[in-house]
Amino acid sequence: MDLLTSSLIGIGLSMDCFAVALAIGTSERLPLVRSALVIAASFGIFQAGMTIAGWIAGASLYTEISSYGSWIAFLLLAGIGIKMIYDGIREEHEPTLSGLHAIPVILLSLATSIDAFAAGVSFGVLGSTVLMPALAIGLVCFVVSCAGVFCGMRLEKLLGNRTEIFGGVILILIGIQILTDILPL
């Protein structure tokens, strides 16, 4: 598979990462560059890693877990989204993802990389190599996620504390979209 095709697949797989990074950016209170790099690195590594894992696992395992993948992503995104909304409404406000705690970032990275697993399975079924596509997907996701965090942080400056509620709603909507494939996000 050539670099252009791999990069285009990476752009498609990165759209959920962009939206989630945007939501994280609205609640983040750390230095802009550090936050963006940590979040984007986590998302990019998970996208690349899940692509490789899907390629290794092959089509038989995918058919067994594919019916659960959407539910797993939905539950992770909705749970973190509900927590963000709750924290945004509370009087004593302490951002959900402030401090870049590892668990929420890893869970969001996992939730947004389930499609990359499926892409990896398709690479395996097609007999394609996986290293170059996985690296391209991870790099594209890194760049797109950085942009999402930056945009979210700018949005937070415009809207103030309400952005955590906005970010939580975005995560829940992404979870619903993944679950139903009905909502056009």
From Swiss-Prot:
It is a multi-pass membrane protein. Probably functions as a manganese efflux pump. One of its GO terms (cellular component) is plasma membrane. This is Putative manganese efflux pump MntP. Belongs to the MntP (TC 9.B.29) family. GO terms for molecular function: manganese ion transmembrane transporter activity. Pfam families: Mntp. Its main location: membrane. Signal peptide: none annotated. InterPro entries: Mntp/YtaF, Put_MntP. The keyword Metal-binding does not apply. The chain crosses the membrane at residues 4-24, 36-56, 65-85, 105-125, 130-150, 165-185. It is found in: Cell membrane. The gene is mntP. Keywords: Cell membrane, Ion transport, Manganese, Membrane, Transmembrane, Transmembrane helix, Transport.
